[in-house]
Amino acid sequence: MFLLHALDQTIKKLKAQTANILTLMNLSLGGFAIIAVMHGQLNLSLLLIFLAALADRFDGMVARKFNIESELGKQLDSMCDIISFGVAPALLLYQGILIEFGAPGTIFTVFYIGCGAFRLARFNISENNGYFTGVPITVAGCIATLSYLAIPYFHPVFFLSLMIILSLLMVSPIKMKKV
């Protein structure tokens, strides 16, 4: 009887942490994407960022389905998102093309990361009213990551411009309906 009770309690605790486990999977995939960039494996980094996006998509769904949304989960999600959709895509594009610009490439890579962090901090203190203010970092990060595939087809200035535009869109006052 004791064993069944202990097993039941363990299952309940695990269920309560399912969303956070997915969130940490997002973080892990983003971290591995950064390491892949550092080792020159840019295509692998691209794949890992998109897998992180899948984990990020499901963590919120799981939290709502099991009614386990929490302030801790919200904060953890933002910390993971800055890695997977801020740092990882920025470094992917930096190594892929922006490095050719020297200091401006470096500055706008860091600018993108800073705008992403600001966007997440603003989100964490705002009321949830069915709208986002500014483009979500997950959207900006996926666009930046996807643009890596276009490097052979566009002039390098396009990518520098894209990073600036995505950065400004993340911190813009534009209201976007949540989907």
Regions found by a protein language model. Name each.
Residues 14-24, 65-121:
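Multi-pass membrane catalytic core of lipid/isoprenoid biosynthesis enzymes
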Residues 35-41, 57-74:
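N-terminal TM1-TM2 helical hairpin plus the immediately adjacent luminal interfacial "cap"
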Residues 49-56, 111-119, 148, 163-173:
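Alpha-helical transmembrane segments of multi-pass membrane proteins
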Residues 1-57, 172-179:
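Topogenic membrane-insertion module of multi-pass membrane proteins
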Residues 8-9, 59-70, 115-129, 168-179:
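C-terminal ends of transmembrane helices
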Residues 32-48, 83, 87-110, 146-160:
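Helix-coil boundary and interhelical linker segments in multi-pass alpha-helical membrane proteins
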Residues 28, 54-62, 79, 83:
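Active-site His/Glu-centered metal-binding helix of metallohydrolases
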Residues 1-7, 11, 132-179:
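C-terminal membrane-associated helical module and adjoining short loops/tails
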